[in-house]
């Protein structure tokens, strides 16, 4: 198979344990699966795992410059906030940190796809409402492609998650990879 030249040649997954491959062997990390899937469709795109387990949006902001110092990154898939939500961090703080990360990437001419999270109702109605609107609001403000919920089709499904019920297993990672792949193709790999 001949690999096609693409407007996207190198991308980084910038998130937390949900994208880092927590609990999975290296060959089952999301970055590896996504790169293989893109190549199987003829797209020669290097996918870098820039995700860190346990990372909050604040931690991401602290490391984004270093992560993006890798040369020639064309695209960042940003998915931070799950650990902020689990820790009850004020959604305004999370949104502010994500805005700064987006701005840093855009100032480097790096395209951004935003992959959102959703708070459970156990955090209370107001927290859920404020947290859940972070990602659509940022998508609109910065004109970013949005994956409304990174774990769509995976969350709360025991057969798609590890025994902790929070982190995707190999099968869950395949579903997330397909979700990311669709967004990349729809937004940046149009024929």
Regions found by a protein language model. Name each.
Residues 15-16, 54, 81, 169:
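Conserved G/P- and acidic residue-centered "switch" motifs that form tight phosphate/ATP-binding loops
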């Amino acid at each position: 198979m001949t690999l096609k030249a693409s407007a996207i040649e190198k991308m980084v997954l910038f998130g937390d344990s949900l994208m880092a491959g927590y609990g999975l062997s290296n060959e089952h990390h999301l970055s590896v699966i996504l790169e293989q899937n893109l190549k199987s469709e003829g797209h020669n795109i290097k996918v870098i795992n820039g995700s860190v387990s346990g990372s909050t949006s604040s931690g991401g902001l602290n490391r984004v410059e270093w992560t993006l110092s890798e040369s020639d990154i064309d695209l960042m898939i940003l998915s931070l906030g799950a650990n902020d939500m689990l820790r009850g961090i004020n959604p305004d703080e999370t949104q502010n940190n994500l805005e700064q990360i987006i701005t840093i990437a855009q100032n480097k001419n790096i395209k951004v796809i935003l992959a959102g999270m959703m708070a459970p109702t156990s955090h209370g109605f107001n927290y859920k409402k404020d947290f859940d609107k972070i990602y659509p609001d940022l998508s609109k403000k910065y004109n970013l492609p949005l994956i409304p919920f990174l774990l769509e089709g995976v969350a709360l499904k025991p057969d798609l998650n590890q025994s902790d019920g929070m982190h995707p297993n190999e099968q869950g990672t395949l579903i997330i990879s397909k979700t990311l792949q669709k967004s990349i193709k729809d937004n940046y790999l149009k024929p």
